[in-house]
Amino acid sequence: MFNFDQLENIHLEITNRCQASCPMCSRNYHGGLENPLIKNQDWTINDFKHILNSEVLNQINGFYFCGNFGDPIINNDLAEMCSYATDVNPSLEIRIHTNGGARSKDWWKKLAKVLPNKHCVIFAIDGLADTHSLYRIGTDFDNVLKNAKAFIQ
């Protein structure tokens, strides 16, 4: 039986929007058409604060912004969510999984300032440019690399 006190890590889906049309993604079918059963929705910063209040944030070790049905960087409140969470519990570890194809280099530099070294962003890079273009349709390989470099520097 689940006991709330045992909760240590949380997997969050803060959006189900994505700029990519990856053929293996559940958001898409028949070669990239959007799945009509998945509605485009985002959590707001208020949703985040309500669900992950200070009691929850102080109990857990960390959380993952994952993109099973959307890419977390598409959510306009992502950086604010990260700031809020680390302000409440500075020992939290935040992990973000992304295709890395959205946003500008400046946005990525700002996110890097919000997330110091102990946090992690995982960029989905599927091979070199030719292979990447097959599996991450709607993203540009060179842009993903530029964004990753902007975040790292």
Task: List each model region and its residues.
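Flexible loop/hinge segments that line or gate small-molecule binding clefts
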Residues: L128-D130
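Short, intrinsically disordered, charge-balanced linker/junction segments flanking boundaries
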Residues: A148-Q153
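Conserved alpha-helical substructure of the radical SAM core
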Residues: M1-C120, L134-K146
